[in-house]
Every structure is written in structure tokens, then in C-alpha cells.
Amino acid sequence: MSAIPAGLAIRFKRWEGNADLPVPAYATVGAAGFDLRAHVPDDAPIVLKPGARCMAPTGFSVAIPDGYEMQVRPRSGLALKNGVTVVNAPGTVDSDYRGQVCVLLINLGEEDFTIRRGDRIAQGVIAAAPQWPLVEVEDLDATERGAGGFGSTGV
């Protein structure tokens, strides 16, 4: 496990109406990501039709230290078993965002998928995100690869 800088923590603020949902947490000691759960009413689950997208709320806001981001990533089991994944994977939650964290999901499967209250819908991973100096130049350093892309180095 890599060292976390002293005094830094990820702080979650619970939104009203989700006292029954657990705070995001790591499922195992070695987990890189922590579970994000759906904050939808018990009587109004989200039914995600094949090919459809939705924005699923988590019921939490988050404070991330400057210089870091929270990446919102798919859950592999959801993708494998149901074809449900994060549309903009990885989604980015910036350190200065304080609104509710929502997850953009898409159903790539062939059957309806129902998202119920408390379902684990994605995982959050904290990653360094420094703001690098951005500099315009006339030319870039030459490389062996050059401008070749999209399969130019082999399949």
C-alpha cells in the first residue's frame, strides 16, 4: 500500500434521505476502489433499457484534496454479467466539485437492468491529478513513432 500524505483524507457528506446507505468504503484490504451505491427511492428504481443511459445519484458529496481527483470506474461484475458500465469511464470528480456525485451508466446488454436503492453501481479511485504547465510551441520533439496512431504499432 502506498503512503497517503499526512493529514489528507477523503471526506464524504451525506445527502438528506440516505441515512440507511453506508458511506463509500473499500470492500477488501487490497481494493484500489471504494464502492459507490445508488441513492434512488425504494419505490422508484431506475430501469435501464438496452442501449439506454442514466445518471444515477449516490447520495453523497465529496471533498478531495487539491492535486487529486476521484475517478469513477465501472464494476467489472456489472459489466460482465449485465453489460452495464460507466459511459465516460473513467469519469472525473474534480477536487473543487461539491455537488452530489452521480454515475453515468449505460446498458450495453440485451435485457432491462434495474438499479435499486443501495446497489453498488461503480467504484471510486483516488488518483493524483497535478495541473501541469500548458505551453504552446512551434514544433514537438521528433520520435520514432511520429504521428502514427490507431494501430500503427501493430495489432
Curated annotation (Swiss-Prot):
Q: Gene3D superfamilies per the record? A: 2.70.40.10
One Pfam family, please name it. dUTPase
Group of enzyme by EC:
hydrolase
What is an annotated GO biological process for this record, any one?
dUTP catabolic process
Q: Which cofactor does it need?
A: Mg(2+)
GO molecular function ontology, one term from the record: dUTP diphosphatase activity
Signal peptide start-end: none
Residues given in the record as substrate binding sites: R75, S76, G77, N88, T92, V93, D94
Q: Which domain of life is it from?
A: Bacteria
What Enzyme Commission number(s) appear in the record?
3.6.1.23
- Pathway connected to this protein: Pyrimidine metabolism; dUMP biosynthesis; dUMP from dCTP (dUTP route): step 2/2
Q: Which InterPro entries match?
A: dUTPase, dUTPase-like, dUTPase-like_sf, dUTPase_trimeric
Reactions performed catalytically = dUTP + H2O = dUMP + diphosphate + H(+)
Record key words, sorted: Hydrolase, Magnesium, Metal-binding, Nucleotide metabolism
Function noted in UniProt: This enzyme is involved in nucleotide metabolism: it produces dUMP, the immediate precursor of thymidine nucleotides and it decreases the intracellular concentration of dUTP so that uracil cannot be incorporated into DNA.
Record-stated family: Belongs to the dUTPase family.
Which protein are we looking at? Deoxyuridine 5'-triphosphate nucleotidohydrolase
**What species is given as this protein's source?**
Caulobacter vibrioides (strain NA1000 / CB15N) (Caulobacter crescentus)
Q: Gene name, please?
A: dut
